[in-house]
A protein has these predicted regions:
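Membrane-interface loop-to-helix entry segments
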Residues: 158-200, 260-264, 365-378, 429-437
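Membrane-water interface regions at transmembrane-helix termini and the short interhelical loops
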Residues: 59-62, 87-88, 104, 112, ...
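Transmembrane alpha-helical segments of multi-pass small-molecule transport proteins
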Residues: 41-45, 114-115, 142-173, 187-196, ...
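Membrane-interface "cap" regions at the ends of multi-pass membrane proteins
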Residues: 1-66, 216-229, 248-253, 445-448
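Hydrophobic alpha-helical segments and their helix-loop junctions in multi-pass secondary transporters
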Residues: 129, 134-138, 188-214, 228, ...
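Selective recognition of specific alpha-helical transmembrane segments in multi-pass small-molecule
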Residues: 48-51, 74-82, 117-128, 188-200, ...
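Hydrophobic, membrane-embedded alpha-helices of multi-pass small-molecule transporters
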Residues: 35-52, 199-204, 214-278, 301-322, ...
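C-terminal membrane-solvent junction of multi-pass transporters and transport-like membrane proteins
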Residues: 378-448
Length: 448
């Protein structure tokens, strides 16, 4: 038994290189994935509870039509552009983010952005674990009336831990495991989502009733259109930044662009609209307050329909949970030189522990992510598209410096700029653009 554990823990670069997930080098053509399963995986990843939360927040801040439809589209479009730019680098180089950071931040310097993003994405995993626990706690304990009662409930603790174990087991099988759960889940997620939209509109008394409810709800709101767009951008800009983890598997360029399109323009936009409906129709519901959607509306349609809704929500969180856990696993495996399976268990345990207490700070955590992560990718974008893309295709890190001061100067400038962002632009975009500009200047100046 001890010998098996030693072998499991042991780093075998050749075995990792030849695995389906290959965290240590650029993928070979044989390691790229078929289009259908990869796009299904993207849809499952995009079905993240953030969309419901974001939509619910907007539903309580601006009119549903046409404001919410337009602002959510524009915000998702901005994230899609970033995701497509970054994701295309992943496709062309076949490299995960950890490898891309080595080319730009240096062989040693890359440890800082990789470990930083990994810690934050493990925290993101904790958010999804907590959401699963909340879903089942509210479903099994309809009498709960206070938020504190949710997190102290034994039902929450047990179901959150089970969710963490479930996500870890699926991710243990790598991208193949993610595809297997995503493919059958897509149809269920779409059907449940569409039915929930239909029921919300019926609950409001039709579309005209919905618009009347929306107008009355936001009559005293001070939220502006720009603020609404910024909320949407902040909710998924981090997902756009880590896009190479999945686009590297694409066999064709259009697939690399389709992945962020499906995640952001289709899945997230769909969820934001559903969440906005929930925010308008059920603004006083504990379900809506904690998950962005009131599953009680489905429960009122009968036990079968209600539990289909609960299971659909659970599937959405499952496909999101394992796809999120995969991100820090690949990044840490590539930089720490530990087997992917080992990092899956470690990251899964950490995410599960965080899931028991982090969900209460969802919006604070989201703001932290959206401010600190985007500037990290700015130097990668500039280096690839404007300075020296050839080195990304060399397949070797020989000759790469241990540290690249230009990248760290650019990141610090970008991160600081998020706190001084003008009101008309999202801090995340300010940070990203600042890091790109400063990196280009520093790279041209310091390398003369």
């Amino acid at each position: 038994m001890i010998e098996k554990l030693k072998n499991w823990w042991k780093w075998d670069p050749e075995a990792e290189k030849n695995s389906a997930d290959n965290p240590v080098t650029a993928l070979t053509d044989n390691q790229r994935r078929n289009t259908g399963p990869l796009l299904a995986l993207a849809f499952g990843w995009g079905f993240l509870v953030t969309g419901l939360f974001t939509g619910s927040q907007l539903g309580n801040g601006i009119p549903f039509w046409p404001d919410i439809i337009v602002t959510t589209f524009l915000g998702n479009l901005a994230n899609f552009i970033v995701g497509a730019i970054v994701g295309y680098i992943g496709y062309k180089t076949a490299c995960n983010s950890g490898l891309l950071y080595r080319y730009v931040y240096g062989n040693v310097g890359a440890y800082i952005p990789v470990l930083f993003i990994s810690i934050l994405t493990i925290g993101w995993q904790g958010i999804v674990v907590g959401a699963f626990g909340i879903t089942w706690t509210l479903a099994l304990n309809p009498g709960i009336e206070a938020v504190d009662d949710i997190f102290s409930s034994s039902t929450f603790i047990i179901t959150a831990i089970l969710a963490g174990i479930l996500y870890t087991i699926t991710t243990y099988f790598g991208v193949k495991g993610l595809e297997r759960i995503s493919i059958p889940s897509v149809a269920v997620l779409v059907l449940v989502g569409l039915y929930a939209i239909y029921l919300n509109i019926i609950q409001a008394g039709g579309f005209s009733g919905l618009l009347s409810l929306s107008s009355a709800l936001v009559a005293e709101s001070q939220m502006t259109t720009v603020e609404a767009i910024n909320i949407v951008i902040g909710s998924w800009i981090v997902g756009a930044v880590v896009m190479p983890e999945y686009t590297r598997f694409a066999k064709k360029g259009w697939v690399a662009i389709a992945i962020p399109f499906i995640v952001l323009i289709i899945a997230q936009w769909f969820l934001q609209i559903l969440g906005a409906l929930g925010g308008v129709v059920s603004s006083d519901s504990l379900f809506s307050a904690q998950l962005g959607i009131d599953l009680n509306i489905l429960m009122q349609q009968g036990m079968i329909i209600g539990w289909i809704g609960i299971i659909g929500m659970s599937l959405a969180l499952w496909t999101t949970g394992d796809a999120n856990l995969y991100l820090p696993v690949i990044q840490t495996s590539s930089i720490l030189k530990k087997p992917k399976n080992v990092m899956t268990v470690i990251c899964g345990i950490l995410g599960t522990i965080l899931g028991l207490g982090l969900y209460q700070y969802f919006f604070e955590f989201l703001n932290l992510l959206s401010s600190l992560v985007p500037p990290l990718i700015g130097p990668v974008i500039v280096e690839y598209y404007l300075i020296n893309k050839e080195k990304f295709h060399s397949g070797s890190f020989d000759g790469i410096a241990s540290w690249n001061p230009s990248a760290f100067i650019a990141y610090i400038a970008g991160a600081v700029s998020t706190y001084y962002s003008p009101a008309f632009i999202m801090p995340a975009i300010t940070g990203l653009l600042t890091s790109m500009i400063i990196y280009w200047i520093a790279r041209k100046t310091l390398t003369r």
